[in-house]
């Protein structure tokens, strides 16, 4: 049953944007698992982030040109921005590897990137069923659960760093990498919360 007014272009653009989240996160996970050809592969993440920025801009442009929207104008803006934020931090994590010359990232970083992949996939599934107000909340709940897991992984990884890393410069680099990755999972949770609010307003 469709509870939201029909405007396929908005939903198409949101689907495109959420797909870029998954693509960027998968690229980052691959880099962290096997960090060869760093420069080229980080540029690939950057290219996906640029495509997402263009899609976000297209959503905002359409919003400004539309008299009737499928849900609150503010929520359209918030959803676009929050989805884009996830990829911004995914891209930032990738760039930390080049900036800090991290050639052997700690294993927990790939674990965190894997959680971002899972969150991005859940967000994409939630966006895909948003038009018909389908099982969006189930996907939002899973994103939030994964964020709790990421918090635990990040805390454990940082604690381990202070126990085992003897080089203070490396410690600072790795700690910041963990924090940027964990922030990406926080941003995914923020996006899920926006999705949830849209559904609850439409119920």
Language-model-derived ranges and their functions:
Residues 1-203:
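Cytosolic, long alpha-helical scaffolding segments
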């Amino acid at each position: 049953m469709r509870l939201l007014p029909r405007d396929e272009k908005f939903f198409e653009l949101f689907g495109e944007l959420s797909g870029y989240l998954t693509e960027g996160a998968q690229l980052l996970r691959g880099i962290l698992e096997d960090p060869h050809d760093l420069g080229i592969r980080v540029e690939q993440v950057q290219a996906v982030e640029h495509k997402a920025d263009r899609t976000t801009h297209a959503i905002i442009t359409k919003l400004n040109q539309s008299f009737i929207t499928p849900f609150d104008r503010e929520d359209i803006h918030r959803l676009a921005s929050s989805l884009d934020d996830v990829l911004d931090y995914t891209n930032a994590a990738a760039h930390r590897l080049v900036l800090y010359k991290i050639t052997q990232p700690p294993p927990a970083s790939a674990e965190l990137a894997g959680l971002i992949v899972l969150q991005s996939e859940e967000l994409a599934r939630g966006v895909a069923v948003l038009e018909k107000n389908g099982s969006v909340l189930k996907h939002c709940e899973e994103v939030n659960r994964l964020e709790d897991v990421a918090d635990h992984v990040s805390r454990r990884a940082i604690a381990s760093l202070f126990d085992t890393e003897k080089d203070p410069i490396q410690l600072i680099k790795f700690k910041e990498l963990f924090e940027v990755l964990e922030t990406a999972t926080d941003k995914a949770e923020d996006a899920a919360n926006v999705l949830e609010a849209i559904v609850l307003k439409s119920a």
